[in-house]
């Protein structure tokens, strides 16, 4: 979210040459649905569709992601150092992605890939070795996380009381 401010050294890790192009087409602006048009007119969408602003801001966004990676590494090092890794399940996710100018939009508003495809990383020391480091392309939702935690911890839940299924079934 704006303002994108990254502390040192992350604010200088990337530069404008690291920014990839946007996914957008003039067709998306010609006769858009009124809702789509309204989101395109929002200030943050306008900021991301200004290529000069976009190329200035996205390296900071990338730096913030690197900062998160660094702190996840610190957490894992702490768990390893204190012999807690074998008894700790780590779940890392985000609430939404960001358009970063794709489809003439900024932030999260609608349901294109940049907005809905988010990281979901699960590190479970009890996971079978053949599944470690694997990637899953099937869609899961945030509501699937709580049932997954309950099942991972050996508990049970009434499926009519929780909206999502455990994603352990995907394994």
Question: How should each PLM-predicted stretch be described?
Answer:
Residues 1-87, 91-139, 152-161:
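Active-site-proximal cap/lid insertion segments
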Residues 164-171:
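Short, intrinsically disordered, charge-balanced linker/junction segments flanking boundaries
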Residues 142, 146:
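Zinc-coordinating Cys/His ligand positions in small cysteine/histidine-rich zinc-finger domains
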């Amino acid at each position: 979210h704006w303002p994108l401010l990254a502390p040192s050294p992350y604010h200088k890790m990337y530069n404008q040459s690291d920014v990839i192009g946007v996914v957008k087409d003039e067709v998306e602006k010609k006769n858009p649905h009124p809702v789509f048009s309204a989101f395109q007119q929002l200030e943050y969408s306008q900021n991301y569709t200004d290529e000069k602003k976009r190329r200035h801001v996205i390296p900071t966004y990338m730096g913030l992601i690197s900062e998160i990676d660094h702190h996840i590494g610190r957490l894992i090092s702490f768990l390893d150092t204190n012999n807690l890794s074998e008894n700790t399940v780590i779940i890392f996710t985000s609430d939404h992605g960001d358009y970063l100018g794709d489809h003439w939009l900024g932030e999260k508003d609608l349901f294109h890939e940049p907005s809905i495809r988010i990281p979901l990383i699960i590190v479970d020391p009890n996971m079978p070795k053949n599944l470690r480091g694997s990637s899953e392309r099937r869609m899961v939702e945030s509501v699937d996380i709580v049932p997954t935690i309950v099942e991972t911890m050996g508990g049970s839940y009434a499926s009519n009381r929780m909206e999502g299924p455990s994603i352990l079934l995907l394994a």
